[in-house]
C-alpha cells in the first residue's frame, strides 16, 4: 500500500516519534459534511501547530467512494458508527482504514485527539 503512494512524501514533525515516507490523507464523512467540515479545519490547525503535513478533508457520506483511491483513512461521524464495517468492506481493496470518531472528541471538536486516532489507525 505505501509504495503506490510514495509521491506524497512527508515526514512527521518533532513532537511525534513516528516517521512516514508518505502524506497521510484523512477523509471525514457525515450526513452532509457540514459538522465534519468544522472538525477538518480544527484538525488541519492542530497538524500545522505540530508540524505535520497531513491532508484532511470533509465530505458527505454519499461522496466517500469518489475519494477511495485518494485517501488512507476514513473517519465517520459518531452518528454513523454502525456503518464502519460496511465502509471498511467497500474500501478494503483500496487499502483504506475506517473507523468512527469518538462521540466525546466529536462534541468537543478535539482535533488533536481525532488526528491521533487517524495516525494510530494508519500504523495498525
Language-model-detected regions and their locations in the chain:
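Short, surface-exposed alpha-helical segments at coil->helix boundaries
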Residues: 37-40, 81-88
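Short, Lys/Arg-enriched N-terminal segments with co-localized hydrophobic residues
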Residues: 3-22
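Ser/Thr/Gly-rich flexible loops in soluble cytosolic domains mediating phosphotransfer, phosphorylation
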Residues: 25, 98-124
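Short acidic/histidine-rich motifs immediately flanking catalytic phosphotransfer sites
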Residues: 68-73
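Short acidic active-site motifs
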Residues: 60-64, 83
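Short, well-ordered alpha-helices that flank and scaffold nucleotide-derived cofactor binding pockets
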Residues: 41, 45-49, 89, 116, ...
